[in-house]
A protein has these predicted regions:
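Helix-rich catalytic cores of soluble enzyme domains
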Residues: 122-256
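Acidic/polar, glycine-rich intrinsically disordered N-terminal extensions of enzymes
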Residues: 1-126
Length: 256
């Protein structure tokens, strides 16, 4: 007889998050960040994104966008403090944000290391096994997507195999692909096959990570993918591609 699969619920923190620096230092970092966006600005290398910033009231010169802090904070205030990330199995649906904590496998490794210690490029078989392990682990709330890159699959269709593996071998929430507009659209279509197109329109079913390029550049590839997911009401994690000691300061505070 099959053993029921255990799955931990979303963890809710009842203690404060770790504070690396005093509140005064956090405020100083925030103020300096606002000055950079107001005075230096950020490059948005996409015509539609530029038009959106103009319509929102930002100061736009060519592809350089300077954003007033009041405008920026008013836009940030529209982001919900938490949201529900729906799984194919409703019993594995989780809450993201607020005091909630979820655990997700890593994303984007080109290599895997076997039990024999050999380090090699990842394969589709490796990815399938990693998705199965993520599904079987009660402490993981998601199967991610690109736990490792299946390097033998040609890049133009690799994303299809990655998402198929995540959906086939796990019924936990999964993550999207952001390497092109077309691939993001394919992810949304595959989610529609699993959840139903109407359900996807009204519910969050996939979360994706996009990275700006240091220093201060959003390129067309990332912006195109962001627009696809946003127009389908799917959440995004916007993160800097910060490499401590390379593209940022080596210290945690300096990198922030």
């Amino acid at each position: 007889r099959a053993v029921p699969m255990a799955s931990f619920p979303t963890l809710v923190r009842n203690i404060p998050t770790y504070q690396m620096v005093p509140d005064e230092a956090v405020e100083l970092i925030h103020d300096e960040s606002m000055k950079i966006l107001e005075e230096v600005g950020c490059e948005f290398r996409d015509d539609e994104a530029i038009s959106m910033w103009k319509a929102a009231g930002a100061d736009v010169t060519g592809t350089r966008v300077r954003i007033d802090r009041a405008l920026l904070m008013s836009l940030v205030a529209k982001v919900p403090p938490e949201f529900t990330l729906n799984a194919r199995n409703p019993g594995r649906t989780v809450k993201v944000g607020g005091k909630n904590t979820i655990f997700v496998p890593m994303y984007g490794a080109p290599y895997v290391r076997g039990l024999d210690g050999e380090r090699r490029y990842g394969s589709l078989a490796d990815l399938n096994n990693l998705h199965k392990l993520a599904y079987m682990s009660p402490a993981l709330h998601s199967s991610s997507s690109i736990i490792c890159e299946p390097m033998e699959i040609p890049v133009p269709k690799r994303h299809l195999h990655i998402i198929h593996s995540a959906l086939k071998h796990s019924d936990k929430p999964f993550m999207g692909i952001v390497t092109s507009k077309e691939r993001a659209e394919d992810v949304v279509k595959m989610a529609g096959i699993v959840f139903g197109d109407d359900y996807v329109k009204d519910n969050t079913v996939v979360v994706s990570i996009t990275n700006c390029n240091s220093p201060l550049v959003w390129d067309a590839t990332m912006l195109d993918a962001m627009k696809v997911y946003a127009r389908h009401n799917q959440p995004l994690i916007l993160a800097p591609f910060a490499l401590c000691g390379a593209s940022t300061s080596a210290s945690a505070v300096g990198a922030v």
